[in-house]
């Protein structure tokens, strides 16, 4: 026994002083968090349609992402970088929140290897494999990503071609619990091919990116025999965007088209997930997004997101769905650390069905807040904010107070940070 322990100790010591460990000069620590406390007119904080009316004063969760990364090998132009990230989500209701009873949910979000310096002709191009957030395109004030093909995969990114760079990836994004009538075999494997070209500048101050995502459901033999929802077609999503420097900020225009199982993203504020839960053989959708961040003065800045989307036949019952959403957030910096924030958002969505009926959704949110953060940068974090919000369902959906009210208010304190 003593000999075994001595052998193990020697092995551990040798591992700790090995060249591969000593090569790690620093660990990169990065992440995101939001947390807070608040009340509404009906108990705890209400959260309603935040991707449509805005997130400020309209979030009720505690969420965090903790990432660790390190360059584990470096020789001349060749670099091997390992990255990892875990996430945690809870409702913030108790002191001790564990996985018991789903008080808290933990997830493995990223675990990948990124290699530079091995592609001839471009030492900055990256070969990668593993699980990662893949080039996500974010709309921060409504907490959604309009282009988001993330998951386990592999690819080559940022390979210089002409004035820009090409990225090609294969990413897995399965659909779960599609049809539980097939016992133990209701998850469908879906593979995406993602191709992007970014960096072409047609004029001074501009920047463009275009891409295509091709989703391929890959059912098992049993699922193919069963048919139905498992008999899903391959789908495509096209994205093109152009950004323009403007008054020290920017404005961006995004145009998107999607069909089949990807079409519903155009009216759901989604970023590329495949809908296996509805019949989508004839589905088509379009989306236009305009967003920008403009520092109007040294102390006053404004961020907006305007979304218009339209889709046909996204379910076997739905003829057409139209969506329009507009959210604006203004910020005024009183002192280096004190700011006033206001956010207003509204949306309207109409689903028209093949039987001639329709379903309407719509509403507004108004928020005022006092924030503490180093200014005047609009996105400077960490930030602590005290807020009050009013939320209203203008289409009589009664989403509040146990289905009895069309409106409610929130009051609370929230902190947000990324690093």
From Swiss-Prot:
InterPro entries: G_neg_Bact_CarbUptk_Porin, Maltoporin, Porin_LamB, Porin_LamB_sf. Induction: By maltose. It comes from the Bacteria. One of its GO terms (cellular component) is pore complex. One of its GO terms (biological process) is monoatomic ion transport. Involved in the transport of maltose and maltodextrins. This is Maltoporin 2.
């Amino acid at each position: 026994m003593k000999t075994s322990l001595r052998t193990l100790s020697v092995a551990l010591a040798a591992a700790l002083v090995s060249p591969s460990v000593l090569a790690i000069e620093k660990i990169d620590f990065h992440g995101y968090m939001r947390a807070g406390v608040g009340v509404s007119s009906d108990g705890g904080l209400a959260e309603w349609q935040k991707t449509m009316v805005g997130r400020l004063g309209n979030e009720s969760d505690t969420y965090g992402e903790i990432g660790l990364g390190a360059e584990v090998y470096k020789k001349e132009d060749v670099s091997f970088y390992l990255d990892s990230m875990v996430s945690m989500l809870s409702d913030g209701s108790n002191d001790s929140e564990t996985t018991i009873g789903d008080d808290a949910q933990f997830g493995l979000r990223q675990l990948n290897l990124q290699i530079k310096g091995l592609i001839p002709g471009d030492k900055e191009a990256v070969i990668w494999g593993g699980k990662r957030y893949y080039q996500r395109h974010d709309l921060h004030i409504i907490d959604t990503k309009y282009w988001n093909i993330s998951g386990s995969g592999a690819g080559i990114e940022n390979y210089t071609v002409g004035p820009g760079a090409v990225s090609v990836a294969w990413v897995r994004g399965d659909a779960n619990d599609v049809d539980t009538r097939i016992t133990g075999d209701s998850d469908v494997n879906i593979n995406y091919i993602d191709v992007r070209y970014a960096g072409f500048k047609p004029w001074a101050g501009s920047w463009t990116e275009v891409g295509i995502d091709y989703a391929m459901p890959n059912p098992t033999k049993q699922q193919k025999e069963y048919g139905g929802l498992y008999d899903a077609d391959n789908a495509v999503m096209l994205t093109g965007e152009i950004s323009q420097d403007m008054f020290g900020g920017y404005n961006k225009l995004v145009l998107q088209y999607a069909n089949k199982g990807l079409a519903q993203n155009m009216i759901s504020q989604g970023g590329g997930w495949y809908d296996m839960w509805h019949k989508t053989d004839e589905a088509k959708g379009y989306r236009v997004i305009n967003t920008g961040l403009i520092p109007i003065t040294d102390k006053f800045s404004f961020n907006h997101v305007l979304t218009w989307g339209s889709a046909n036949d996204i379910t076997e019952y739905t003829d057409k769905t139209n969506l329009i959403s507009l959210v604006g957030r203004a910020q005024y910096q009183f002192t280096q650390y004190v700011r006033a924030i206001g956010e207003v958002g509204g949306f309207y969505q109409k689903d028209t069905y093949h039987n001639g009926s329709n379903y309407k959704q719509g509403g507004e949110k108004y928020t005022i807040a006092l924030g503490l953060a180093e200014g005047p940068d609009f996105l400077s974090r960490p930030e602590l904010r005290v807020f009050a919000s009013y939320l209203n369902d203008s289409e009589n959906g009664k989403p509040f107070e146990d289905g009895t009210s069309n409106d409610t208010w929130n009051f609370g304190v929230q902190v947000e940070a990324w690093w």
